[in-house]
């Protein structure tokens, strides 16, 4: 397991919110960040601080995407027609790692990235090991036959802490999902409030 995966709950602690809605999140037990200085009272954030926090929260939710990669996704959202914030969410939710996670084939976004990297996932019948692969509406995502009985997968499909969103059709009996459509921001079931408009403001400074 990578340092990034083992530190997944540190993202919750750093941000101060249970961004995935998981029962074991440390912020369910305390309201301060990690480290020896975590208990210090936070002052009021500046506009920049609020925007930065919104960006870090959104980046964190999708597996703590690197700044370089996240900025690249944002720049594509800007180039597309329509609202940049809506485009940003649509691009993030179209990633293969997000769809495997949303389909409840794995328990966490970090597990999704590792699962894809290890070659357990097919897209339209072909093995795909690129976690950032962008799916299109109509694409069929399937757990490979040799991987369907992995305990990680079987346990994830039984999780009650989240549901499969309606822009994905998941068949857990066949370990297969179809990406129905690119969602609007209002369709995406985040456990905490996300503010893509503030992310746009951050990069527009």
From Swiss-Prot:
Protein name (database record): Small ribosomal subunit protein uS4
SUPFAM superfamilies assigned to the protein according to its UniProt record, in alphabetical order: Alpha-L RNA-binding motif
InterPro entries linked to this entry: Ribosomal_uS4 (IPR022801), Ribosomal_uS4_bac-type (IPR005709), Ribosomal_uS4_CS (IPR018079), Ribosomal_uS4_N (IPR001912), S4_RNA-bd (IPR002942), S4_RNA-bd_sf (IPR036986)
UniProt-listed HAMAP family: Ribosomal_uS4_B
One Gene Ontology MF term: rRNA binding
Known function: One of the primary rRNA binding proteins, it binds directly to 16S rRNA where it nucleates assembly of the body of the 30S subunit.
Subunit structure: Part of the 30S ribosomal subunit. Contacts protein S5. The interaction surface between S4 and S5 is involved in control of translational fidelity.
Pfam (any one): Ribosomal_S4
Region (Disordered): 20-44
Keywords per UniProt: Ribonucleoprotein, Ribosomal protein, RNA-binding, rRNA-binding
Tree of life domain: Bacteria
GO cellular component: small ribosomal subunit
Domain called S4 RNA-binding: residue spans: 94-154
Family named by the database record: Belongs to the universal ribosomal protein uS4 family.
């Amino acid at each position: 397991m990578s340092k990034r995966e083992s530190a997944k709950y540190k993202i919750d602690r750093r941000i101060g919110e249970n961004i995935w809605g998981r029962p074991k999140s440390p912020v369910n037990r305390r309201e301060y960040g990690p480290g020896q200085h975590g208990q210090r009272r936070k002052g009021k954030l500046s506009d920049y601080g609020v925007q930065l926090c919104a960006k870090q929260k959104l980046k964190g939710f999708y597996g703590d995407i690197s700044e370089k990669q996240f900025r690249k996704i944002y720049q594509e959202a800007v180039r597309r027609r329509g609202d940049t914030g809506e485009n940003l969410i649509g691009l993030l939710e179209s990633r293969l790692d997000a769809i495997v996670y949303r389909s409840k084939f794995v328990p966490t976004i970090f597990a999704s990235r590792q699962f894809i990297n290890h070659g357990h996932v097919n897209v339209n019948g072909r093995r795909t090991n690129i976690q950032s692969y962008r799916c299109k509406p109509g694409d069929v995502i399937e757990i490979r036959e040799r991987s369907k009985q992995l305990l990680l997968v079987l346990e994830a499909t039984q999780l009650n802490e989240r549901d499969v969103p309606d822009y994905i059709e998941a068949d857990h009996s066949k370990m297969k999902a179809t990406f129905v459509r690119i969602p609007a921001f209002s369709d995406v079931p985040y456990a905490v409030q996300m503010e893509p408009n503030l992310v746009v403001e951050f990069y527009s400074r």
